[in-house]
A protein has these predicted regions:
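PLP-dependent amino-acid enzyme catalytic core
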Residues: 1-313
């Protein structure tokens, strides 16, 4: 039997669905539940686990022993990949955008503790990460290696994220009107769209872009989900709070107050930014009374240590 499937059954759980109680929701007569993907696994959580699952199974089935991927110095994906490689007995290499001194930060220190080898490259080189010539060279330098794209987004990742909606269709007693996620590379958003097509076609799927100038993702999504237009979905590009990794004072305050009120830990880069956007939409009366909303907690809590180190949060 597959080592990965055996350990999955032992260690990885279906994430719970938690109802949120808040005066804003009561006043506007809307309901909100959070899909707690941050609780899937202690170290490989959230959308990063969803994206990795079928990539890891594919690598195992092919007899491949090493994984390689790309990320920034505080990357949730790199952290999750290192943890997964350690858990499932792969070797792992991370191609890291930035200088070698980042190796001592909380994210990369832990990745190395799990056995990941780091290779630092400058921004110009890093931009080649999707170019075939560059990937071919990496394959020559790292034989018997399975290369996973930055952020983990590919066709196998979409299959993993689809399972969020499949689980929700069994967990929710009533139909979901709106399903929200943060989005960076559009992988999680695309997976939710694909999952909704299969399991919840009347749900509108929303992606809150966490980076500036994210309109290009509207072209990326149909490439990942060719039949995306068969359901209702929307990419919101106006809630980035200054760009990727930017944490405004209002966003930081919201995240802290939300965690205090709900006891649900969130970070301001992805889930916090998404919920802050959702809160503004509710305040503006964008949802009819009786609307049923689900938001996906995509994890990323390991990044809090790095944010504190950078004095951003």
């Amino acid at each position: 039997m597959s080592l990965i499937r055996t350990r999955l059954s032992q260690q990885v759980t279906q994430s719970p669905l938690q109802t949120v109680h808040h005066p804003l929701l009561t006043a506007n007569k809307v309901s909100l539940s959070i899909k707690r993907d941050d609780l899937i696994h202690p170290t490989i959580s959230g959308n990063k686990w969803r994206k990795l699952k079928y990539n890891l199974l594919h690598a195992e089935a092919q007899g491949i022993q090493q994984l390689l991927s790309f990320g920034g110095a505080y990357s949730n994906h790199i952290h999750a990949l290192a943890a997964a490689a350690h858990l499932f007995n792969f070797k792992a290499t991370g191609i890291i955008r930035g200088e070698a001194h980042y190796a001592t930060n909380p994210t990369l220190s832990q990745a190395q503790a799990w056995g990941m080898q780091l290779q630092f490259v400058d921004r110009k080189t890093y931009r080649l990460k999707a170019q075939q010539d560059f990937l071919t060279q990496l394959t020559l330098e790292h034989p018997n290696t399975y290369i996973i794209p930055e952020g983990g987004t590919n066709a196998l990742a979409i299959l993993g994220v689809e399972e969020v909606v499949e689980e929700l269709s069994l967990q929710m007693p009533q139909p979901i009107d709106h399903l929200f996620t943060a989005t960076g590379s559009a992988g999680t958003l695309s997976g939710l769209i694909s999952g909704a097509i299969k399991h919840s076609p009347n749900t509108k799927v929303h992606g809150i872009a966490v980076l500036k100038k994210a309109e290009y993702l509207k072209q990326v999504i149909p490439e990942l989900v060719p039949n995306a237009e068969s359901i209702n979905w929307q990419l919101h590009t106006q809630f980035h709070e200054g760009g990727y990794g930017k944490v405004s004072a209002k966003l930081a305050e919201f995240c802290q107050q939300f965690t205090t009120h709900t006891q649900i830990p969130i970070e301001p880069i992805y889930t916090g930014k998404m919920l802050f956007a959702l809160w503004q939409m509710i305040e503006q009366g964008e949802f009819a009374q009786g609307t049923n909303i689900v938001a996906v907690h995509t994890g990323g809590l390991q990044g809090l240590a790095g944010l504190k180190e950078q004095q951003k949060f």
